[in-house]
A protein has these predicted regions:
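Acidic, Mg2+-coordinating active-site environments of NTP-dependent enzymes
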Residues: 83-85, 153, 177-327, 403-415, ...
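ATP-dependent carboxylate-amine ligase
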Residues: 34-47, 51-64, 234, 267, ...
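Short acidic, glycine/proline-rich loop/turn micro-motifs
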Residues: 126-131, 274, 448-452
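N-terminal leader/targeting and accessory segments in enzymes
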Residues: 1, 10-12, 20-22, 26-89, ...
Length: 479
């Protein structure tokens, strides 16, 4: 049955990426990309057949062996380009991109040539572009091509994000990690990992490599779990907890920035000013500063590097306007990120706080009602809308979020508009001076996937178009 199914599958090879390994007696082992829809159903059926046909655990063992071998072979193909690079990997549920960007700015200020690969931006030797791959970690081939280009450009430090998916899929096997930063662990990706324990174990694969330096969040709920891993060199913790080696002693929030004080090793006082607002960004900054301190970067370079980071696409990104309202686009798509974002924004908002949000399809469904509940409790107004439905029914996604909103008995705050552009338009149109509008979930992304189709889309650009329309109408009225 398995052989027959594989023969049928071979006819469909142009439709999706797959890899074949042939073994004796004409059996096959195959790895199929993460797909959904009709192709996803076929994939699931084939996996069921394989589980019945092969010995228990053989499918998972063979898949892991294949992924390990694939990474090694591709590394060889590109001439083992990661060797000779000083690679810093940032992992965690939230804050990876911002932390990586802070590290990048500090190292550049210290005179190092760097390369950066994050969900939002890619940069090699000062040449930056938006990451439009819709992937935090690219394919293995693209990753090693990135390393190769960095090496050719004379880069010394590479800073990148290491996701739980990439670590589980052995994308970093054989990559020499000099430093690992763990930002936090909160609910996300349970569609893939199933449990928080499995999610934590996937993140811990980075620490199992025994990098020279490890930086951990002392305030994080999962700190004790990750603290059991040792570094081959030094480990540093950061946070508001007095036991943290980099102790955050003072934070002052402003509308367009933050000031903070760090006490490192009970002796070094460091005063920092950043353009990024919010306590959550101060934590990201503290992680970056802790690593820079371990690397021996001068304190003045750390301070200047932190101050150099102006903004990150789709990360608390303000959209300029003449309407007298604050419009912020942010990537927040987990309960923890949304909660912290709403709490921070409330502190710097004079008027009402309006949230425009939805949830991504084909992802962890359990977080949807949780995010709905958070929105109802922390926002003054809610515009519930669609995000990227992938192959799910968007009505069902919104219904799950709505359950959380209705649980709070605050459904009167909510206006449901499926069309995302219309939801943003109505939020902007109904705002008054002093209000803040948060548009979350998509951040920097350049397209949406709806019903399996890739549609060009960017929240910031859509907001700018709507602002232009509103401003034109107001000018006509004044005439």
């Amino acid at each position: 049955h398995l052989k027959a199914s594989v023969r049928h599958l071979q006819l469909l090879t142009p439709l999706f990426r797959h890899n074949w390994i042939r073994f004796p007696k004409s059996s096959f082992v195959f790895i199929i990309a993460n797909i959904s829809g009709k192709m996803g159903i076929m994939k699931n059926e084939l996996v069921k057949i394989a589980r019945k046909t092969l010995p228990q655990g053989a499918l998972e063992k063979t898949e892991n062996a294949y992924r390990v071998a694939r990474t090694k072979m591709i590394s060889l193909r590109y001439g083992n380009p990661a060797r000779g690079l000083r690679i810093i990997a940032v992992t965690g549920t939230n804050g990876k991109t911002t932390t990586a960007c802070y590290i990048n700015e500090i190292l550049k200020e210290a005179g190092f040539k760097t390369a950066l690969f994050t969900t939002a931006v890619i940069e090699i030797a000062g040449k930056e572009k938006i990451n439009d791959l819709n992937a935090t970690v690219p394919t293995v081939a693209r990753l090693f091509s990135f390393f190769q280009t960095a090496q050719r450009e004379g880069v010394e430090y590479v800073i990148l994000e290491a996701t739980s998916h990439a670590l589980s899929q052995h994308k970093f096997d054989g990559v020499p990690i000099e430093a690992a930063v763990m930002t936090n662990l909160t609910q996300d990706h349970l569609d893939y990992h199933k449990t928080m324990e499995a999610y934590a174990a996937a993140k811990a694969k980075l620490l199992e490599k025994k990098p020279k330096y490890i930086v951990l969040n002392r305030d994080d709920e999962w700190f004790e779990y990750f603290d059991k891993f040792t570094a081959s060199g030094e480990k540093m913790t950061y946070g508001t907890n007095p036991e943290a080696e980099a102790h955050l002693t003072h934070v002052k929030l402003y509308k367009k920035g933050t000031e903070a004080s760090l006490l490192i090793d009970h002796q070094t006082h460091l005063e920092l000013a950043t353009n990024l607002p919010g306590e959550f960004n101060v934590m990201n900054m503290s992680a970056a500063v802790s690593l820079a301190y371990l690397l021996g970067i001068k304190l003045e370079d750390i301070q200047e590097g932190v101050a150099n980071l102006e903004a990150i696409p789709g990360r608390f990104e303000r959209v300029d306007n003449k309407l007298g309202i604050d419009i912020i686009v942010d990537y927040a798509h987990t309960p923890d990120a949304l909660e912290k974002l709403l709490k921070t924004t409330h502190k710097i908002t004079k008027g009402r706080l309006t949230l425009v949000f939805g949830a991504c399809g084909d992802r962890d469904k359990t977080k949807r009602p949780i995010m709905g509940e958070l929105a109802a409790n922390l926002a003054d107004r809610i515009f519930l809308t669609d995000e990227e439905s992938y192959n799910e029914n968007p009505d069902e996604i919104r219904a799950m979020i709505r359950q959380g909103i209705e649980r709070t008995k605050k459904a009167h705050k909510m206006t449901e508009i499926a069309d995302r552009k219309q939801a943003i338009y109505q939020a902007l149109k109904s705002a008054v001076r002093g209000d803040t509008i948060l548009i979350t979930g998509m951040g920097h992304e350049q397209y949406r996937i709806v019903n399996g189709k890739r549609i060009p889309w960017n929240d910031k650009k859509v907001v700018q178009e709507i602002i232009s329309e509103i401003e034109k109408k107001s000018r006509k009225i004044s005439l």
